């Protein structure tokens, strides 16, 4: 069985501030360790039409998410979720990563 890692550089722009479990330093450390495993396949997120997201979420929810990202600084969406200006691209690349992973399993 082959294992793929689907990621993009945008994940390094999802700044959640110091002390948060999704910190950039933690993501960087994990990626560096994974890169030592030569058996892994590295893939980029798939580009997608936002209508795909609307199959699972309402247009109003998608609009709320898109408008939640600050131009500067950090914003808490709830007690656990922190976003920064770089989080928007990271969020949509995460969706593309899921699509790419599913396509990989389905051998597309």
Predicted features and spans:
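HDAC/HDAC-like amidohydrolase catalytic core signature
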Residues: 1-108
